[in-house]
Amino acid sequence: MNNQIIKINDIELANNKPFVLFGGINVLESRDLAMRVAEHYVEVTTKLNIPYVFKASFDKANRSSINSYRGPGLDEGLKIFEEIKKTFNIPLITDVHEPHQAAPVAEVVDVIQLPAFLARQTDLVVAMAKTGAIINVKKPQFLAPHEMRHIITKFNEAGNNNVALCERGSSFGYNNLVVDMLGMDDMKVMAPVIFDATHALQRPGGRADSADGRRAQAAELARSGMALGIAGLFIEAHPNPNEAKCDGPCALALSKLEGYLTQMKAVDDLIKSFAPLDTSASDL
């Protein structure tokens, strides 16, 4: 297992440390909603003593339909991020889609996310690496876990060694994702691993013009991932998931956040209390 520690301000992200929550809302729908969601996450994570990084997107550039809501855009999004950071004194994570976005985002945001569909775009990788920001790489649905080494190497060769990997499911036929738990465990050899338990619930293209999801199984899937002993958990919640402008079918209801995280913390604490157990030996 890779026990590299990535420092996000005073937070330690590592496979053998207490898990870090990367949580928030899928896309910035409005300033007021983002502030409300951030405040609730801060209250719950403070109560449960869970290290916390706020997540939202300023632009959803890969929507199924050209008519789908994308977000407020870079400039307005960064203003909202700055207010959240100043108000709650928390680190932030967001995704970028084009090389020119990397530098301005890194001036405000602590962790930059490389989207799964863009994970092999070398120009984007290099631009992100050069900011010196912490990087979260979403594993593409179409790549094997061992292939993530190549993406890490790109970042390293471009001068950035603070790279985490994020599992979000693998394509399993049409309109379906499955999570390869052994594959996620294999990635722990390469870097700190984060589990995106929200987007792993997706049924891509499952609706006429958007993705469907399996919110009812959010706790089951997340508990399974936490049982691997990982560095972080990535989730999205919404006050009214059925009214969310993106990925509502996968989002947790905000009112369920405390109970959900209480379970995840209990699993993480239990798993990381065990002594290492080597089952590779073949002797009797």
UniProtKB/Swiss-Prot annotation:
InterPro entries: Aldolase_TIM, DAHP1/KDSA, KDO8P_synthase. Pathway: Carbohydrate biosynthesis; 3-deoxy-D-manno-octulosonate biosynthesis; 3-deoxy-D-manno-octulosonate from D-ribulose 5-phosphate: step 2/3; Bacterial outer membrane biogenesis; lipopolysaccharide biosynthesis. Signal peptide: none annotated. It catalyses: D-arabinose 5-phosphate + phosphoenolpyruvate + H2O = 3-deoxy-alpha-D-manno-2-octulosonate-8-phosphate + phosphate. Pfam families: DAHP_synth_1. Gene3D superfamilies: Aldolase class I (3.20.20.70). The keyword Transmembrane helix does not apply. GO terms for biological process: keto-3-deoxy-D-manno-octulosonic acid biosynthetic process. It comes from the Bacteria. Keywords: Cytoplasm, Lipopolysaccharide biosynthesis, Transferase. Belongs to the KdsA family. This is 2-dehydro-3-deoxyphosphooctonate aldolase. The gene is kdsA.
